[in-house]
Amino acid sequence: MVQGSCHCGAVQWRCQAIPDSAEACNCTICRRYGVLWAYGFEGEGISVSGATQSYIPRRTEFHFCFACGCVAYWREREPGPKGRRRIAVNLRLAEPEAVAQIPIDRVVGLDDTFKHLPRDGRCITDYWF
């Protein structure tokens, strides 16, 4: 299990299992937010709590803490064809030692292809210095 919270602790998330990877995306939103995402489906091993404010650019809702402004998670606005709603939590809100060895998957989101690049051996600890 791994968990994280915003700076003030009002918004929290929990993953029942250690994520297999963290995603670093270079799209205009993720790059500016400086996030590392762990993906799953709402109610299926990932839970979130606390009041948030959201920004809804298209099909996703980016959720921030009302008090401190930390980006906590995003989720799809509507469930997919199988009735499941995709969600991603910001692993940068976890304690560093809890997520240090999770490998990074790099994604090209800037051109909207969301193509995965080959792994280069880096993990979260390499992104935090």
Language model region names:
Residues M1-S5, A10-F129:
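A short Gly-Trp-Pro
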